[in-house]
Amino acid sequence: MSSDGTPGRKRSAKVRSSVSGLEIEVLREAGDWESSTDETVRRAAEHAYAVARGDESAELCIVLGDDALVAKLNKAYRGKEGPTNVLSFPAAEMPDTGAPEAVFGGATPLLGDVVLARETIAREALDQNKKFADHLSHLTVHGVLHLLGHDHMEDVDADEMEALERDILEDLGIADPYGADHPGQ
């Protein structure tokens, strides 16, 4: 039982990246996550942020959930039935001013939350012949890029976002998640 009395909920200490100005909190909300998961998602998030945004200070929360939690959020916020692999909830649009202090009054801006679904990610990794940690890293990168304003609604935007994901993942030593070696993409 956690300090707030909720079974299964566990907050990690906020960790400020030495690579970027990103402060990351990992919240284990639900699901059977490996002990190494916190480090996997932190590494992916900080690298995505460093590549896409630079060294500006910011905070984000990564929520480790299960299919039931993500299905509930998916229905409530997107009107869609069932779980998905990752959801992103931006706290505010990050204006491209180059100086977040000017917009956020000196406070560290909160990017938002990235919520991951354990069972869906495991199922997809198996179906697509990917390592679980690699697929988890990809979806974490994907979620962080959404918090930074990237989307894939139009083909040109999808191409740009996927290229950025490929570059970030290559830096992390992870194969192209959209390549021919991964069916189902």
Curated annotation (Swiss-Prot):
Its main location: cytoplasm. It is found in: Cytoplasm. GO terms for biological process: rRNA processing. InterPro entries: MetalPrtase_cat_dom_sf_prd (IPR023091), YbeY (IPR002036), YbeY_CS (IPR020549). Zn(2+) binds at H142, H146, H152. It holds the Pfam family YbeY. Its EC number is 3.1.-.-. SUPFAM superfamilies: Metalloproteases ('zincins'), catalytic domain. Binds 1 zinc ion. Gene3D superfamilies: Metalloproteases ('zincins'), catalytic domain. It comes from the Bacteria. Keywords: Cytoplasm, Endonuclease, Hydrolase, Metal-binding, Nuclease, Ribosome biogenesis, rRNA processing, Zinc. One of its GO terms (cellular component) is cytoplasm. Its cofactor is Zn(2+). Single strand-specific metallo-endoribonuclease involved in late-stage 70S ribosome quality control and in maturation of the 3' terminus of the 16S rRNA. NCBIfam families: rRNA maturation RNase YbeY. Belongs to the endoribonuclease YbeY family. HAMAP family: Endoribonucl_YbeY (MF_00009). PANTHER family: ENDORIBONUCLEASE YBEY, CHLOROPLASTIC. This is Endoribonuclease YbeY. It comes from Parvibaculum lavamentivorans (strain DS-1 / DSM 13023 / NCIMB 13966).
